[in-house]
Design a protein with these regions (language model features):
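Negatively charged, low-complexity tracts enriched in Asp/Glu with abundant Ser/Thr
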Residues: 1-71
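Sequence-level detector for tyrosine residue identity
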Residues: 5, 73, 80, 112-114, ...
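Generic alpha-helical secondary structure signal
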Residues: 9, 82-84, 118
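Intrinsically disordered regions, especially transient/low-confidence alpha-helical propensity segments
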Residues: 48, 61, 84-86, 126
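Short amphipathic beta-strand/extended segments with alternating polar/hydrophobic composition
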Residues: 56-64, 86-94, 117
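Short, internal acidic amphipathic alpha-helical interface segments
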Residues: 67-107
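Ampiphathic alpha-helical segments that act as solvent-exposed interaction surfaces
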Residues: 99-142
């Protein structure tokens, strides 16, 4: 018997995998998934001062949708925010860029700016580490 695909369960598994990866990252001080029984969001508190960057209340929020079918593209966003800025790496349809992958950023009351982006990682755990590396570089060079 073949198991039927459930996009909600697949999304939950992807988020749980991302949560576990972020819990192992030395910058993440607390990582929580909501709601616990069927994750739709992960929030990580980040100690970015360990990277030599002074920011207040730094968080990374992760959303993941595995797609309606096993062959569908996964859609995700890893979105960083603190008292000064918010930006993120996203993979979903967006009218401002060609393709699915993009980086978006907003400072203050200004609207978002968008840049196309490709991702090297092929699974949620690897992608979580890739995003944390991108985040480190982004904060270091600001």
């Amino acid at each position: 018997m073949v198991d039927s695909y459930n996009s909600s369960e697949a999304s939950h598994r992807a988020l749980r995998t991302s949560q576990q990866a972020l819990e192992r990252h030395p910058i993440a001080t607390a990582v929580q998934g909501f709601p616990d029984d069927n994750l739709t969001e992960i929030r990580a508190d980040l100690a970015v001062e360990r990277w030599g960057t002074e920011r207040g209340s730094a968080t990374l929020t992760v959303h993941w949708f595995a797609g309606e079918t096993p062959d569908a593209y996964s859609e995700f966003e890893f979105h960083y925010s603190d008292g000064e800025t918010d930006f993120g790496w996203h993979h979903h349809e967006q009218g401002h860029v060609d393709g699915r992958g993009h980086f978006q950023e907003r400072t203050g009351d200004a609207g978002y700016t968008y840049e196309p982006r490709t991702f090297q990682a092929q699974n949620p755990a690897q992608l979580s580490w890739e995003i944390m590396s991108l985040l480190s570089s982004k904060l270091y060079f600001e």
